[in-house]
Amino acid sequence: MKLLLLCLGLILVCAHEEENVVRSNIDISKISGEWYSILLASDVKEKIEENGSMRVFVEHIKALDNSSLSFVFHTKENGKCTEIFLVADKTKDGVYTVVYDGYNVFSIVETVYDEYILLHLLNFDKTRPFQLVEFYAREPDVSQKLKEKFVKYCQEHGIVNILDLTEVDRCLQARGSEVAQDSSVE
């Protein structure tokens, strides 16, 4: 009987954990706010290596009235953290486009609004298209279980170049600039 109750308890815990995961009909107003870049992956390694054009670190996402998303990122240029502001336009449910290092189409794969968000991007630059997968969290780091979930997703999509950004300088010292604070006012 005790074993049965233990199993039932574990099932309820797992079901509760999974019920918070949103994979469709995402309420973008709930993803507005502060985020941290945790993991980054691409099928073109040089894009995410140090000084790679797609090695950017998110600070803030804001849902705009027209359903677009504005992003505040930081990147390292010549050893210094530089802010980048981008606006991604919504094309259909959960699909966005933005021009940065080529033409990009991305979707929100899944989110737990108060914990993490997983984005999958296709970039069409002049040389060759590539995939990029980004994992952001509300806190500076996440559990090993979530990191393993990200790795599994990447492997299922043929992406083997994966970086744990919690182990590098993510320009955390540059967060909270006056411009970024102004953009977070709702």
UniProtKB/Swiss-Prot annotation:
<comment type="similarity">
    <text>Belongs to the calycin superfamily. Lipocalin family.</text>
</comment>
<dbReference type="InterPro" id="IPR002345">
    <property type="entry name" value="Lipocalin"/>
</dbReference>
<dbReference type="InterPro" id="IPR000566">
    <property type="entry name" value="Lipocln_cytosolic_FA-bd_dom"/>
</dbReference>
<protein>
    <recommendedName>
        <fullName>Allergen Fel d 4</fullName>
    </recommendedName>
</protein>
<comment type="function">
    <text>May be a pheromone carrier. Acts as a kairomone, detected by the prey vomeronasal organ and inducing fear reactions in mice.</text>
</comment>
<keyword id="KW-0732">Signal</keyword>
<dbReference type="Pfam" id="PF00061">
    <property type="entry name" value="Lipocalin"/>
</dbReference>
<keyword id="KW-0325">Glycoprotein</keyword>
<feature type="disulfide bond">
    <location>
        <begin position="81"/>
        <end position="171"/>
    </location>
</feature>
<keyword id="KW-1015">Disulfide bond</keyword>
<dbReference type="InterPro" id="IPR002971">
    <property type="entry name" value="Maj_urinary"/>
</dbReference>
<dbReference type="GO" id="GO:0005615">
    <property type="term" value="C:extracellular space"/>
</dbReference>
<dbReference type="InterPro" id="IPR022272">
    <property type="entry name" value="Lipocalin_CS"/>
</dbReference>
<keyword id="KW-0020">Allergen</keyword>
<feature type="glycosylation site" description="N-linked (GlcNAc...) asparagine">
    <location>
        <position position="51"/>
    </location>
</feature>
<feature type="signal peptide">
    <location>
        <begin position="1"/>
        <end position="15"/>
    </location>
</feature>
<dbReference type="GO" id="GO:0005549">
    <property type="term" value="F:odorant binding"/>
</dbReference>
<dbReference type="InterPro" id="IPR012674">
    <property type="entry name" value="Calycin"/>
</dbReference>
<keyword id="KW-0964">Secreted</keyword>
<keyword id="KW-0085">Behavior</keyword>
<dbReference type="GO" id="GO:0036094">
    <property type="term" value="F:small molecule binding"/>
</dbReference>
<feature type="glycosylation site" description="N-linked (GlcNAc...) asparagine">
    <location>
        <position position="66"/>
    </location>
</feature>
<keyword id="KW-0813">Transport</keyword>
